[in-house]
Regions:
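Glycine-rich loops and low-complexity Gly/Arg-rich segments
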Residues: 33-37, 72-74, 93-96, 137-139
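C-terminal edge-of-domain segments
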Residues: 99-139
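Conserved mixed alpha/beta catalytic, RNA-binding, or beta-rich assembly cores of soluble enzyme
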Residues: 1-52, 129-131, 138-139
Length: 139
């Protein structure tokens, strides 16, 4: 059975973040990794957020027509991230919420394309994880 690649963008952000912060982070992520969030190869297939951060990411998903996956906040510390932010470790128990969320949402065996990016206003972060999904299986 042939596998297809699932691209999941995970988000982390401060309370002060706006929809524009997340949108800019997603655009920057897409530009950095050459991904587009429309149909086709290299697309960002899904967005992901911790349950406590869900409403703003759901709004972005509605605007960009991208499905959103929810990750349990309690799962964040179970993931090894590339970034080790002291502030994130203290607040959420993980080195990067965006990286942890992307990996958890993409599923077992997922890998990050690189460390998280930070929005221009420094209020949001985004990371892109990839996983192989057997053809015919949907999440």
């Amino acid at each position: 059975m042939k596998a297809q690649t699932l691209h999941v963008a995970g988000f982390g952000f401060r309370r002060e973040a706006t929809l524009a912060s997340l949108g800019q982070a997603l655009d920057q992520l897409a530009e950095q990794y050459g991904a587009i969030y429309q149909c086709g190869a290299g697309a960002i297939d899904k967005l992901a957020a911790a349950r406590s951060m869900l409403p703003l990411v759901e709004e972005l998903g509605r605007l960009r027509n991208i499905e959103v996956i929810t990750v349990a906040d309690a799962e964040l510390p179970t993931v090894t991230t590339l970034t080790h932010s002291a502030q994130s470790l203290q607040a959420r128990g993980t080195g990067s919420v965006a990286e942890a969320v992307a990996l958890l949402a993409a599923g077992p065996g997922a890998t990050l394309l690189g460390p998280r990016i930070i929005s221009a206003d420094r209020q949001a972060t985004a990371a892109l994880a990839l996983s192989e999904v057997p053809e015919g299986i949907t999440e």
